[in-house]
Each structure stands twice: as C-alpha cells, then as structure tokens.
A protein has these predicted regions:
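Short, conserved phosphate-binding/catalytic loop or strand-edge motifs used
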Residues: 2-10, 44-55, 60-63
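Internal, well-ordered alpha-helical segments in soluble enzyme and binding-protein domains
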Residues: 3, 26-30, 45, 64, ...
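Conserved, hydrophobic alpha-helical core segments of structured domains
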Residues: 57-180
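Flexible, glycine/proline-enriched loop segments at strand-loop-helix junctions
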Residues: 14-19, 36, 55-58, 67-71
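Acidic, glycine- and histidine-enriched catalytic cores of nucleic acid- and nucleotide-handling enzymes
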Residues: 1-44
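Short, surface-exposed, polar/charged, turn-prone segments marking secondary-structure boundaries
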Residues: 15-18, 48, 111-112
Length: 180
C-alpha cells in the first residue's frame, strides 16, 4: 500500500490534486505536520502546495490567524515559520508580514507554550514593519486585546534611551502586559 510506504519513507503526500485549492489552510497543516513528524513534503505535493498559496488571500483572517497561532505553540515553530517564509506564504498573508525573528530567541528563554493568544499574536507581529503591525492584526481579525497591546508596543519602542526611572514608570504604567 502506497500510504504505508509513504509513512516508512517519511513522505507527506496529499490524497487528491485539488486538496490545497479546496481548503488552502491544509497548506499550514501540511507544513506543521511535516516539521512535527520529520516528514518531507513529496515533490508533486510540494508543486500543488505552491499552486495553492495564491488562494490563501481568499481565506478569512480568523482562520489564518488561528493556523499561525497553532504553529506558535508547536515545539518546531521556528522551522515551521522558516518553511512558511521560504514558500512566500507570510508575504501572501500581508506584504509587510515578516518572519518572526525573535521567535527563536524568545523560545530559548521563555516557555511560550503557556502564553495566551494575545501575547503570542504580539510576538508573531513584532518582526513585521511597525507601521503595518496594526493593519496586519486587523486583516487577521486579531482581538481588541492584541490591538491594545500593539499600541503599547509603540510606546515601548518610542522610549528614549536616557530616561529617568520615574519617566519610564509613567510611560509603562498604561502599557498592557502582553506588549512588555
């Protein structure tokens, strides 16, 4: 049976040629499962996956956001985002969306599996162009909490280097914890 052979050879293969076109969120799942299980996406499946990428723009922001957040909770999240980036998927989601560079650094020092969706969403958007973070968050239908945290992030980024502790306190008192 071809399915058992694929498992033995650690190949991920779709069942029919329209699979990614019928539901292009399967692209995210294919990448997630291939990285999680150490499988290689079979060559014809990869061709069809690439063809399906252009359809991602027809998927609701909520579904895309949900898939990206699921990836953030995976142990292999960095390699999964590298794969998304290498296929150009992040740029299809939004031209200013960038690979979350800080994901690897943060993952090494903090257990982000326990973070809530607002914190994960902010981390996801942190490496994107600051001028477009809110636009990206809105296009992905992220929560109001994410939008508030992103505005707090702007406050943090605009802090001057040589500032007194009292001034730092005044600036940070209203910044949501997720932005910190």
């Amino acid at each position: 049976n071809e399915g058992f052979r694929d498992i033995d050879e650690k190949l991920l293969r779709i069942l029919h040629h329209r699979s990614f076109l019928d539901d292009c969120t399967r692209i995210f799942r294919a990448i997630r499962y291939s990285e999680r299980l150490g499988f290689i996406i079979e060559s014809q499946t990869k061709v069809l996956l690439k063809e399906g990428i252009k359809e991602i723009c027809n998927v609701s922001g909520t579904r895309i956001s949900s898939e990206l957040i699921r990836i953030c909770y995976e142990p292999e999240r960095v390699s999964m985002f590298q794969t998304l980036d290498s296929f150009g998927i992040l740029k299809v989601i939004h031209p200013e969306m960038a690979f979350p560079e800080d994901l690897k650094k943060v993952s090494q020092v903090v257990d982000i599996e326990n973070w809530d969706k607002t914190e994960i969403s902010c981390l996801l958007l942190f490496s994107s162009n600051p001028e477009y973070r809110e636009v990206i968050a809105r296009s992905l239908h992220m929560s109001k909490g994410v939008l508030v945290a992103l505005s707090g992030l702007k406050v943090l980024e605009n802090l001057e280097e040589n500032i007194s502790n009292a001034d730092i306190y005044q600036h940070l008192i209203s910044v949501p914890e997720a932005a910190l």
